[in-house]
Amino acid sequence: MSPSTQSFIVDAALFDMDGTLVDSIAAVEKAWGNVAEEIGQDPEYVIAATHGKRAIDNLRQFKPHLKPEEMDNAVSQFEQTILDFADEYNKKTSSYQSSVISSPATMTPSSSAPSSRRSSRANSLFEQDAYDVKFRNQLSGFAIPESAIEEEAAVDGITEDIRAAWNAEHELIDRSVRILPGVRDMIDSIPEGRYAVATSGAKTYAYGAMSRVGIIPPQVTITACDKRLKAGKPAPDPFILAAECLGYDPKRCVVWEDSPSGIRAGVASGATVIAVCTSHTRDKISNCGAHYIVENMESVGCDVQPDGRLKFTITSDV
């Protein structure tokens, strides 16, 4: 297949955050799954219903008992749980590793080759046995004084400690925040003042997620708790406000989105919309009105024109 290119020029770029710039979907879904269990709803239903929408709108829907004066605190607490779930894996694996005897010959579960990290329980048990063998073989190269410990008891005891650490770590799910493909190059190619972030996340979550992957929130970052917003996505308000704060007409901007509600918000704002298939398959977002659909930002380049405007070039295989 030969590559095909399409280009257009705009004044500025407006980015959604989660699913577009960063991937924290696993932590978000875990947090909403907990809410679902708390209120006795099906987690899959709640997760699907909340995706791409503001936490405040979702909490109003699923926790109608919350009073208006309680809502800001409820949103802040909920979004902190997202960040806690995102940080949980790295914190606990670090703790497990530090609890195991440290020596040049000691391997921890995290330090084993990635190819050995299988997800099934059967494979996990196989890995543990193989790991025990490796560890025993490594210990065999060292002389353990009889006056200090009995060799076999020591090896068995250490092996059990490592097996326990393996079991604990293996049960964890890595929900850490990740930057998505092509994002760093895209952001670096756009001058300050020519792009903004408009997210359904409140400030705690939005700034926390971006900082975890090394993205400096732009001067114009519209979050769900912005009091100037009358409505969140799928209403166009977040993108319209972001464009206005940059000083541009939203119709002369490009919106980057990943979720159906966000794509519809971008279309309603009048902007050119690029949808990325980073959280939904192409068939799930193809009928939302996006002008272009790409796998991720690696398919798109941005060049600054002499007058400061942005030329986006989309490359696809045809």
Which residue stretches match the model-derived regions?
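Short "lid" loop at the C-terminus of a central beta-strand within the Rossmann-like core
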Residues: G52, A202-K203
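Conserved phosphate-coupling serine/threonine residues in phosphotransfer and NTP-handling enzymes
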Residues: T20, T199-G201
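Glycine- and other small-residue-rich loops at beta-strand/loop junctions that grip anionic moieties
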Residues: L172-S176, A198, A231
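N-terminal helical cap/lid subdomain that shapes the substrate entry/recognition surface
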Residues: Q6-R184, P191
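Generic beta-sheet signal
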Residues: D11-A13, Y195, C253
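Asp-based, Mg2+/Mn2+-dependent phosphohydrolase catalytic module
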Residues: M1-I9, I101, T106-S119, N123-L125, ...
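Non-catalytic, surface-exposed connector residues within folded enzymatic/regulatory domains
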Residues: A49, D72, S200, G232-K233
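Residue-level detector of anion-binding/catalytic polar loops
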Residues: D42, R194, T272
